[in-house]
Swiss-Prot record:
GO terms for biological process: cell wall organization; cellulose biosynthetic process; glycosylation; saponin biosynthetic process; triterpenoid biosynthetic process. It comes from Saponaria officinalis. The lineage of its organism: Eukaryota, Viridiplantae, Streptophyta, Embryophyta, Tracheophyta. The chain crosses the membrane at residues 14-34, 42-62, 478-498, 508-528, 546-566, 581-601, 636-656, 669-689. GO terms for cellular component: endomembrane system; membrane. Mainly expressed in flowers and flower buds and, to a lesser extent, in leaves, stems and roots. It is a multi-pass membrane protein. GO terms for molecular function: cellulose synthase (UDP-forming) activity; glycosyltransferase activity. UDP-alpha-D-glucose binds at residues 99-100. Component of the oleanane-type triterpene saponins (e.g. saponarioside A and saponarioside B) biosynthetic pathway, leading to the production of natural products with detergent properties used as traditional sources of soap. This is Quillaic acid 3-O-glycosyltransferase CSL1.
């Protein structure tokens, strides 16, 4: 059966968005007409005008996402003839077993091994950038358990193929109405899984194993060779452990360098035309995800220029009261659909199926570098260069397994990329620490397209951050990296405009400059309460027709956001939480990310990779599920937040007192209202501040 996919334009949503753009633009124009007509009203007025110009600039960029939203669907992926399916490699990257629990990593590995895909066409690679003895030891045991698990899943067509998730209470509904053979086999595989977990737990307690080794030679080990699957045995995919060489003082280019190493190593061992990239804490939740992606990659209309299929990041541990917006609803349920209606979504850090050759050339000439300067582009390995050609099987024929492994050690060496185009024109770029986002941007600029699929059943599930510090560190990292791109020679306003559509350029410009929200909120957060405290009016008085323009912009923005939240299946409470966390992120993570990018630009700081802690603390999780903010470890971010919250609280009551005394209610009405609105949003933060203060005194 031929793969089938559909792309449906969301006509109602697009029409409403375009009408809103016209209406809101008229209101914004009215506001600025009023501001500039009264521009001589003092420095506070000028600062407020500048802040509003910044906000209007970002708002204008955002409208590109709303111009042509589409929804895609696939049909009959499970009916695709296995002979039609191309080879697929799965790349899973881990870096530190202390921050990325090794049991979570192994669940991701085992779930990938159990994908509904021909075993002889599937290969799973684990990149251990920490070179940890623990990870290498445990993956061998994972392969032993994996053979039982893959066999069990295939025999009974198990839908949830992450063992940890399958044996949890979430999957009780899947384990009913089965015969005795199933129950016996399930009991057997469960006992093996429990034994595996105990083994991992005991090994993790050994301090000599749970370490990161930053001075080491390269190591490539075939944990399980799919070619050795015997007749009548469970067919399990190729499983490979890779720890590239690392030496002190050498720039290893973080995750981008790790994936480029995997590209070379896998090029000799499996050389699949497509690969899936997964975060180490994100497991395969739907075994048909690869087949669904192939419904696009095998489509003759899309295939020649299609670089990647992107799935949303969905998390199993986000609560209904998602105070940190861990699910990133605005991105995955609004913005990505909007970009998909242009030439495709931005590449996320995980859950995407990418065409290997897209990283080596352009859609119209994928082999240009291979043909014109193979050694300069791809390095000195003749065997690897041979693997890039059309006759790969012929090129590698006659090489023994030991010879291939010896060559992979060379490909994983830290000096292999010296004087080559790796990291610039070949593979993932090293110009930005946000390797996937930047890679997707460059692919679009080369002429490639992408598609976005948001199926009803999540194809991949991960673990979201559940405390303030980790959530803000993540946003700070993204802001710094994206601002860095925005002010570089690859800025969407210069580099992209001549290579992709204006609308898509504006989408990327939004990602690059959304950190400027910090400027708007910092000015508003200081000037507005200060002027209220001093009795200086910054808005038209109550009853003045010009106030309707300001009120219109405010209400129009809130209603647009509310519509998007409700239409994506969320609640009013989710809308309120998003309003709050938007402000918090802007005056904390975006502010520090902006400063970090500026310091990197002038050379005061050097950009460094910050690994997010993925180990979940039960106490923090309990706070998160109760809707309480956790400020532990987030002192750096809390300083500007607490100062502005307390300042706004003091200025509101001080300004209200002054207004009552002077009876200038009409002049100060708008400022009092905005201050009260911010206080309402800030209430949970003030509550946590008071709670911590009481706890500190007791």
């Amino acid at each position: 059966m031929s793969p089938h996919n559909t792309c449906t334009l969301q006509i109602t949503r697009a029409l409403l968005s375009r009408l809103h753009i016209l209406f809101h633009s008229a209101l914004v124009a009215s506001v600025f007409y009023y501001r500039f007509s009264n521009f001589s009203s003092g420095p506070a007025w000028a600062l407020m005008t500048f802040a509003e110009l910044t906000l209007a600039f970002i708002w204008a960029l955002t409208q590109a996402f709303r111009w042509r939203p589409v929804v895609r669907a696939v049909f009959g992926p499970e009916e695709i003839d296995p002979a039609q399916l191309p080879g697929l490699d799965v790349f899973i990257c881990t870096a530190d077993p202390r921050k990325e629990p090794v049991m979570e990593v192994m669940n991701s590995v085992v779930s990938a091994l159990a994908l509904d895909y021909p075993a002889e066409k599937l290969a799973v690679y684990l990149s251990d950038d920490g070179g940890s003895p623990l990870t290498r030891e445990v993956i061998r045991e994972a392969a032993v358990f994996g053979k039982y698990w893959v066999g069990f899943c295939g025999k009974y067509n198990v839908k949830t193929r992450c063992p940890e998730a399958y044996f949890s209470s979430f999957c009780d509904g899947e384990r009913v109405d089965h015969n005795q053979d199933y129950l016996n086999d399930e009991l057997s595989v469960k006992s093996k899984f429990e034994a595996f977990k105990k083994y991992v737990q005991k090994a993790s307690e050994d301090a000599t194993k749970c370490i990161v080794v930053n001075d080491r030679p390269s190591c490539v080990e075939i944990i399980h060779d799919s070619k050795q699957n015997g007749e009548g045995e469970v067919k399990m995919p190729l499983l490979v452990y890779v720890a590239r060489e690392k030496r002190p003082g050498f720039n290893h280019h973080a995750k981008a360098g790790a994936i480029n190493t995997l590209l070379r190593v896998s090029g000799l061992l499996s050389n699949s035309p497509f690969f899936l990239v997964l975060d180490c804490d994100m497991y395969c939740n739907d075994p048909t995800s690869a087949r669904q992606a192939m419904c696009f990659h095998l489509d003759p209309k899309l295939a020649p220029s299609l670089a990647f299929v992107q799935y949303p990041q969905i998390f199993y541990n986000t609560s209904k009261n998602d105070i940190y917006d861990g699910q990133a609803r605005a991105a995955f349920k609004t913005k990505y659909q909007g970009m998909d209606g242009l030439r495709g979504p931005v590449m996320s850090g995980t859950g995407y199926f990418l065409k290997r050759k897209a990283l080596y050339g352009k859609p119209h000439d994928q082999d240009e570098l291979l043909r014109e300067q193979p050694t300069k582009a791809f390095g000195s390995s003749k065997i690897f260069i041979a693997s890039l050609g059309e006759n790969t099987c012929v090129a590698l024929k006659g090489l023994s397994k030991d010879e291939l492994l010896q060559e992979t050690q060379k490909l994983a060496a830290c000096t292999y990329e010296s004087n080559t185009l790796w990291g610039s024109e070949v593979g993932y770029s090293y110009d930005c620490l946000l390797e996937s986002t930047y890679c997707g941007y460059l692919l679009h600029c080369k002429g490639w397209i992408s598609v976005y699929l948001y199926p009803k059943k999540p194809c991949f599930l991960g673990c979201a951050t559940v405390d303030m510090n980790d959530a803000m560190l993540q946003i700070m990292k993204w802001t710094s990296g994206l601002i860095g791109v925005g002010i570089s020679k690859f800025s969407p306003f210069t580099y992209a405009m001549s290579r992709i559509s204006i609308m898509q350029s504006l989408c990327y410009a939004y990602f690059a400059f959304s950190g400027l929200f910090a400027v708007f909120f910092l000015i508003y957060g200081v000037v507005l309460p200060y002027s209220l405290l001093q009795g200086v009016p910054l808005f038209p008085k109550a009853g003045d027709p010009w106030l309707l323009a300001f009120a219109g912009v405010f209400i129009s923005s809130l209603l647009q956001h509310l519509y998007e939240v409700l239409s994506s299946g969320e609640t009013v409470k989710a809308w309120w939480n998003e309003q709050r966390i938007w402000i918090i992120k802007s005056i904390t993570a975006c502010l520090f990310g902006l400063l970090d990018a500026m310091l990197n630009k002038i050379g005061v700081l050097k950009a460094s990779f910050r690994l997010t802690n993925k180990a979940v603390d039960k106490q923090k999780l309990d706070k998160y599920e109760k809707g309480r903010f956790d400020f532990q470890g987030a002192q750096m971010f809390m300083v500007p937040l607490m100062i502005l919250v307390v300042f706004n609280l003091v200025s509101f009551f001080g300004g209200l007192r002054r207004t009552v005394i002077h009876k200038n209610y009409e002049d100060m009405f708008a400022q009092l209202f905005l201050s009260l609105f911010i206080l309402a949003l800030s209430y949970p933060i003030m509550e946590e501040i008071v709670r911590k203060a009481r706890k500190g005194r007791s």
